[in-house]
Each structure stands twice: as C-alpha cells, then as structure tokens.
C-alpha cells in the first residue's frame, strides 16, 4: 500500500514525491522508506506509483470507432473515425482534462494511424467513401497539429492506404504498412514505410520485410517496432520489423504466434504486443530486442486500445473472435511485466482509441456494433509519496 509523506513549506503541508540519499557521492532515489514504531518498521514513503480508475471525463464531441489518438505538448488528441458516417472531428484533452475541439482533419476518414514527432501530432492515411458512387477512397493525407493545436498539412504519404500503423523513433515519425481495395474488390497490401522528421520533411526508408496491414507499432529504446498484421495473402503474420533512430531496418525474433488486429504500447524498458484475433498472448521486447512472453491477457481479444500511464502499460476493451460480444477489461503491465487488472472501462466496447496526457491514460469512443460511443474513461497514477 502506498504511504504518504509530507513536509512543511511556507506553513503548508506538501506531499513528498521523491526522496534521494547520498551513496558513494551519488544521489540515489529512495524506493521505500520506513520508520520504527514500537519496535516495528512501518512504511512512511513509497516511490511506487499506484494505478487507479479515475472515472469518465467530458465525452467526445461525436461517438465513433476505428479512429486514432496521440498526444502533443499538453494535449491528448482523438481524430477521425466512423459512426455510420465518416468523421473528421478532432477532440483535445488538456493535462487537467479540459476538453476542446481544434480544427478538424482536412478530410473525413477512418482506419488511419497517428503518432507524434517533435512538436507535431500526425494523423496519416485512412479511407473515406465517394458520396456519389459509394466506392472506398483511400487517402495519403497527413495532418499535423502543433503544440498550440494549429493544423497544417505536410507532404502526403508515398502510397494511399488505410489500416496502417505508426510510431516514433529518434527524430522520425514512421507510418508503416496498410492496404487499399481496388474497384474489382481485390486488395493490395503495402510494405511501405514513410518517415517524417521533426520539421515534417518526408523520406522513405527501407520497406517492411513483408507487405501487411492490421499491424501494430510502438517504440522501445532506440527502436521503432512494427509487428503482426495480415500479409498480402490475408494470413496472420508474426514478423516484427525494427527501425533504428537512423532508420536502419532489422528483423528481431518474431512474435510467438501470428496474429492481426493486435495492440501495442511500451512500459519501462519493454515494448509490448498484446492480443489479436483469437489471442491472449503478450510478447515483450527489451531495449536490445530480446523477446520474452509475460503473463497472458486476462481475456483473448482484438481491436483493443493500448497506452501507458506512469509505470503501467494498459490494454483496454476489445472484441471476442466470432462473437458479437465485447470486453470492458483493462490489463495493466508494470515496468517489471507483472500483470494486474484494475477497474474496467465503464462499459464493454471495441474499436476504441487510447492516448496519455499528463498523468491520465484516456480510452475514448468505441462500438459494440449497436451504437458508437462518446465515452472517455480515464486512468491515473498517484505518483510517489
């Protein structure tokens, strides 16, 4: 149990967040501190953060699913999505969870990807529908939001595509994979990776080792990782591609099982790939790309959302294979890969999006196929002390 420690500052009790002690002329962080009471050691300080469910916050402007989220500066952003109609709405949440609606995306779209590089949040790719023919239109568009939420439109992706993934490594935001559907209803999947510098200059590093879509991406140490997905034959893939901070590609050990529609986030020194169609497996990659397999998710599910708050990587919501049932479960992995299950989402749903702003991890939107939701659930950590 986390204990509280206070110190007097200008006549007010202030909570102690961190304590350091000198060891061999170096400042070492105190993780736990005890005091003797009646001959028994009693804890009075812990630097370990405690994860808790904060509750629901101001809802999204539009209920929707199949959208994306990222953070820039002091804002968490949710952009695009589908709710029976295709949307361009962007919702912003400040570090104090104040909700606002900045300029919308330049085009309505869903099944897009998002990441942040430098001072810009990027939303790239996706698809929409021709209002006359009702044909799918796949988009190469990238919208960039500054730390003051001013939108601009940098160079497009090299290929128009949807169901791609994005992450950031070093000074580059990467968009990888994706697919488009031709008028004859055949699919083309892509191995393409587009890189955007902190000044939004686009380049094209080495492609993924295979064309695929429905993959997941995250970053650990000096590597951006793209894992899983469907290959060009629509079969689940286990391949993981790693990009260094200089955009050199390598292929570390594959996922322990092939899967698509999985989720990814990073915590401590680990990148986590969790779930996927019919899977409860979680694979962890260290900063040296050594793969391990921590405890499985508490339920096998796909179309989850994932984010990290404090020392916890969270996987929330999702659907069950071949069933019209959805989950409200949240699985939390600590920086030492210990799994716990905090209070779940306020209700079950899949196709949601997640990001973190300040001390809050936010899970927004989603669907259960009967409705599209505006709800945003927040998780927080209490910090040290």
PLM ranges: what are they?
Residues 30-32:
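Trimeric viral appendage architectures of receptor-binding fibers, tailspike depolymerases
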Residues 2-12, 21-22, 35-385:
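Kelch-like beta-propeller repeat domains
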